[in-house]
Every structure is written in C-alpha cells, then in structure tokens.
Amino acid sequence: MAFFAPVYEQLMPVMNELLLAYSSLHRLSGSEDAEHAASLLVNLLRSHGLEARLEQCPLLLSDPITGSLTLTDFPDWQCQAKTRSFSAHCPQGVGAALYYDAQSTLARTDLEWQAWAQQVEGKIVVADQGFEDYVQRLDAARAVGLVHIWTSAETALHEETVGPIWGTPTLEDAQRYPRLPVISINQRDGQRLLNTMTHTRLPVGAELRTELARHVRTCSLPVVEIAGQSDEFVLLSSHYDSWHEGVTDNATGNALCVAMAIHFQQQSAMLRRGLRIAWWPGHSNARYGGSTWYADNYRQQLGERCVAHINVDSPGCLNAVQVVINASGAESNSFLNHAVEVITGKPALRITPLGKGGDQSFWGSGVPLHFALREVPIEKTSDSPGSGGGWWWHTEEDTYDKVDLNILWRDCQIHAHWLSALLIEPSLPIDAVDYLENNRQALRQLQQRLDPEFSLEQIAQKLRDLQDPIAHLQHLSHSHPDRWQSILVRTVADLHRLRYSSTDDFHYDLSYRGGAFPGFQPLAADLGQTTPETALMMQTQYRRQCDRALALLQKISDRLQK
C-alpha cells in the first residue's frame, strides 16, 4: 500500500491555529460561542479547498448554571459546588436531613436495595458516586437530593451529566429524567462535610439549590466529505462542543480531524473509499445528541455504505504518553497495533472493548468497525476518565497549556496510518473469527455471574455453530473482497447488535447500560435475594433477551448458509 505521511510543517500550523481560536471560546452547544466555533471550523476547511457544510440538528439541552449546599445548623459552613446536566432545576432549594451512603460504590442484592430505599427516602444523600443508574435509584426511592463527593484529590470541580437517555428523548424517555437535584463537591470539602456529620449527634439538616437551563436549540453540525472511487466511506468524528474552553476535550480532536481532511483531500485520487468527517454538537449537554441525530437521519446510508467509525476524543494531552485503543473487537489487532508501532516503536499498552460513551451511537446502524484512540499518563493521579487522565478534565482549567503538540502530532500520524489502510486497501481489517471467540469468552464470563436459572447455553451453542462458517467466509472475503466482503460486514454488524445493544436498531440503550450483552447484565444477581416482583421481571427480561439473541444468531446462520 502506498502511504503518504502527513507533513508536520503543513498541518501543525493549521491545527495550532484552530486550538488557539478555540481556546477563547466556551463551546457549550446552543451558545453563541459554539455556533461561532462551527462557522470558524467550516471556514477554515473551505480556505483549504474543502467543500464543508453545516447540517442543522435540533437538540434538547440541559445547561448547568449553579449549585450550592448549605447546612441548616452550621451557617458558616461553606463549599464550592456544581450541579449536573439534566439534574432537576430547583432554584428555590430543597431541604432535608443528610444521609451518608458509605457503601454507594459496592454491589447490593435486590433485598439490600429495598432496605436502602427506605433509608434514603426523604433524605439528601451524600455518596462517593453520582452515576446515572444510582441517581435513577435515588429518584425511585424518593430521595430529596444527592451530594456526590469526587473521589480523587484535585480541588477543581468537574462538569458532568446525570441524564440517563442517549441522545434526544422520545415521549416515553422523558419520564426518566431525574426529579431530584444533584450537585458535586470536591474530596476535600466532602471530607469536611462527613466530619461534620460524624461529630454531630442529631441528623445534620441541609439545603440544596440548583439552577439549570433546559431548552431546545438548533445546533450546527459541520461535515466534510472527500469522495473515493466507490460509494463506501469511513466516518471520522469528534465533538466540537465542550465544557468551558475544553482545549483537550475536545479542541485537540477537532484539530486532528481538520488535519486529516486536508491530508486526504491531497490524496483523493488514490482513495478507494471516501472519507466523511463530522464534528458533533451536543456531546456534553445533550448526552451525545449530535451523533444520535446523525444516526437517526442517515441510518440507511450508514448501513449501506459506512465501513468504519473512528471517534477522536481528547488526543494530544499533556503527560498522556501511553497509547490505549478502545475497539469493538471486530478489528484485526495487527491492523490496530501496526499504526501505533510504526509511530511509537511499540504496540498499544492495551486494546479494550468500547464502553458506554464517546459518541458511540452507531451500534444499530450496520457499521462493522468502531474504534478510538485513548491515551493515559504513566502514573494516574486523578479519577478523571478523559483528557488523557488529566485532572483538568471537564473543568475551567482545560486550557491551551494542557496540550502537548508533540503528542498531538503522534496521534495525528497514528490516525493517518489507520485511515490510509481503510481508505485505500480493498480488504477491510476485519477479524470476525477472533471477534466470535471473544464473544464466546465474554458470554462464559457473564454466565458465571448469573443465577443458574438464567442459562445462556442455547446462545453459546449458536455461537459455537458459527465458528466454521465464519472462518470460511472470512477466508473468502480476504481472497475475494469484491464478492464476499459485504456478507462479512453484515455478519459482523449483527454480532455488534448482539454484544453492544439490547434493543432494536431504531432505539438506544440507556446511557449507563453497558458491558457485553447489555440486556443480560441486569440479571447478574442472586435470585434467592430478590423479591418475587423483581424475580418475575428478571425472568421476563431473560426470556425476551434470549429470544432476541437467538433470532440475531439465526439470521447470521441463515445468511451464511446461502
């Protein structure tokens, strides 16, 4: 394969130009700065001869404004606090006694959850986590509010969301948004709060106030396309909205995508497949609203023509010297690692399955390859899941000085290698044989966590039966891609539906429902420690998810027998 390396002297000034421009823009979707950023991006692309356009997508946005915590009997006690996107809007405040859930991060049985619900009802709960599923339980238990204590020592407060809905909600989804206020405080203030609670005989009364702006706005979604010889294309994406200036999350990703657009426009005569690049709005305050809108509005086109989705989120971060790859599992590991080895001299630190996040909105779209580069420091000192592990993630401190241009250039070159292979080579780097085995292993691990009543043996047998047919198809596809590759693509896409989704192609799982075979994950509980009501619901979910899985596997089997 002919590979033309990106040229530093040509592309780095363009990337840096965008970084400097974005470093003074607060790009929360729906804001003037965000719309200005989208226009600036399109104008930059056009100035380099690219035909960029702005799509328009309506999104439901939840913008955190203020959050506060006061203690009724300790008027001098103060702390900094932030509310969370899609928290309840309670500007008048809510008051109740504080209750510390010391085991909030531990697993509980159904009966333990029932007892817990009685303890938290009517309380403002203090906890060491604030994930969406926990907030949902608090809401159902009629807790009054949540104070989330951040678990690592940085004093900066991180913006986050408690929205359980992936993308824009439907009418039924809307009922799931929290009805209680949620705030976060840092670890230092959290320990002060717990000390006050510990050394006070009577329950400590508190008041939470939150202000949020929940509204609908039409947001810009920049897109550029570079045509190839066929109508197939690779989708490269990054979210351009941010919390505050968000230079590493995600102006660096936006700049990398601009560089790839310029580079591959210059190689367009060589491209077998096209390159489509999208910059999403609504990642932050619409819970992946932009990418979900795109999946909804281009579903057929994605299913028929898109061969890969590469998401770019937070490259080029200070101290993030180690490369990690998050991938669907259908990608050849040698393909993924080759680009990293060529640029860094060694393979990725690890390749792990994609989790819930990162605008992974395309599991029901029929796309076979999904992966993303991630990077981590040698020594992690923060519980920050983004910005290369940097403590500044989702804070006002995510500024230009947190960028390492050398690391950004490294990441740019890795993406150029990946894209060159995908855009030029006739065979896609699909390893369906290895992916099938990974799914079998994940199913075995899941079975060990389930009650024996929830047997997955029928699904396991169907997966075993597919081993030889898929190996044969993969051999044919690599030998004669023009004839057989489309069948391999559809087969892998159905395996993705099995592993990464629990619903149909036209709906989305909740934002917190992850793990392999997500429809079965909630069944990982001891039936002997559940109420009859919960047991019946679990049995019903098991039956429906089994039927869905077996139908998908039968569809694959029928296709391979033709």
Question: Which role fits each region the language model picked out?
Answer:
Residues 2, 8-13, 20-121:
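Noncatalytic luminal/extracellular "stalk/propeptide" segments of secretory-pathway proteins
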Residues 413-417, 422-562:
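C-terminal non-catalytic alpha-helical accessory regions
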Residues 79-175, 179-181, 347-348:
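Extracellular/luminal Protease-associated
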